[in-house]
């Protein structure tokens, strides 16, 4: 159980059987009555935002969340297949729950999977990753100053915009949150 005094950004709580992550919170005292805590919460299951106000000192439950080290095996239609690194148990996760992160998964890659009551919810990947360019238009020699970009297909199938001087076979660093080119490796 958490008290409202334990609230901080990123804390995961359960309200009325639904897991939430605290995005923002503010303690305030109205002119009359006890102190309150106004929170902005993200529903972990749906991603929707919700504002909930708690009385100061009110208790909320900890959600049944668990993080496990897993290995990404392969993609099967609209599902991602992971293997637990300790039990070797395989888990299916719908692509729709990954929020675009599936474009950064390579076969055999290790990552952390967030589970709620045993069901996979989200994957935790690094903020930036180095991936190989497998398909792009040839670049013009010496054109390194202009701000022109072109699409490049990466080894995972993800397509990102890269500067014109990037060629097939180059290894590039990509921001996993914005899917932007960060530099060559």
UniProtKB/Swiss-Prot annotation:
GO terms for cellular component: cytoplasm. Pathway: Protein biosynthesis; polypeptide chain elongation. CDD domains: S1_EF-P_repeat_1, S1_EF-P_repeat_2. Keywords: Cytoplasm, Elongation factor, Protein biosynthesis. Pfam families: EFP, EFP_N, Elong-fact-P_C. Signal peptide: none annotated. GO terms for molecular function: translation elongation factor activity. It is found in: Cytoplasm. InterPro entries: Elong-fact-P_C, NA-bd_OB-fold, Rib_uL2_dom2, Transl_elong_fac_P/YeiP, Transl_elong_KOW-like, Transl_elong_P/YeiP_cen, Transl_elong_P/YeiP_CS, Transl_elongation_fac_P. One of its GO terms (biological process) is peptide biosynthetic process. Involved in peptide bond synthesis. Stimulates efficient translation and peptide-bond synthesis on native or reconstituted 70S ribosomes in vitro. Probably functions indirectly by altering the affinity of the ribosome for aminoacyl-tRNA, thus increasing their reactivity as acceptors for peptidyl transferase. HAMAP family: EF_P. This is Elongation factor P. The gene is efp.
């Amino acid at each position: 159980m958490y008290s409202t005094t334990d609230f901080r950004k990123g804390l995961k709580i359960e309200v009325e059987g639904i897991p939430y992550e605290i995005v923002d919170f503010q303690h305030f005292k109205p002119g009359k009555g006890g102190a309150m805590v106004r929170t902005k919460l993200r529903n972990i299951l749906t991603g929707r935002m919700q504002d909930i106000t708690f009385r100061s000192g009110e208790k909320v439950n900890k959600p049944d969340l668990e993080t496990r080290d897993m290995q990404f095996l392969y993609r099967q239609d609209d599902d991602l297949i992971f293997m637990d690194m300790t039990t070797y148990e395989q888990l299916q996760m719908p692509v729709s729950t990954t929020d675009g992160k599936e474009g950064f998964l390579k076969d055999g890659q290790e990552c952390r999977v967030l589970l709620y009551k045993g069901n996979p919810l989200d994957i935790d990947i690094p903020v930036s990753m180095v991936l190989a360019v497998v398909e792009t238009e040839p670049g013009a020699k010496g054109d390194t100053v202009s701000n022109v970009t072109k699409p490049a297909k990466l080894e995972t199938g993800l397509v990102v915009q890269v500067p014109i001087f990037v060629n097939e076979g180059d290894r590039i660093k990509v921001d996993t949150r914005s899917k932007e080119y960060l530099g060559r490796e």
